[in-house]
Amino acid sequence: MGNWNLPNDEHSFDPNFEDIQTLFLSGRITTMYQLVKRSPTKIAKLLGVNYEAYHNKLSNPEKFTEFQINLMALAFRIDPDIIHNVIQKEIVGKVKDRLKIFYEK
């Protein structure tokens, strides 16, 4: 992971993200879809997508770009690896299925 200097001033942290930060840091977020009811419009705006596109990414977390993962991590003031780990655990089955199809051809 890169060297991330998280902003420390209270004006650069949206209080709506405090619960999301706590949930990620405590390990209670195990799927990205768990964010669906936690400031979805605000997060969609942060990511520069509409609500429907954000909802689609929550259902298919492999569609989040590296930039979007890092942007969310900085906005939530967490290490981007935390989000990466959630996504990796969530998509491991899809990755294995795709690899199996590849080798069967």
Predicted regions located by residue number:
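DNA major-groove recognition helix of helix-turn-helix/homeodomain DNA-binding modules
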Residues: W4, F67-I82
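Short C-terminal boundary/hinge segments that cap the last helix of small helical domains
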Residues: R77-D97
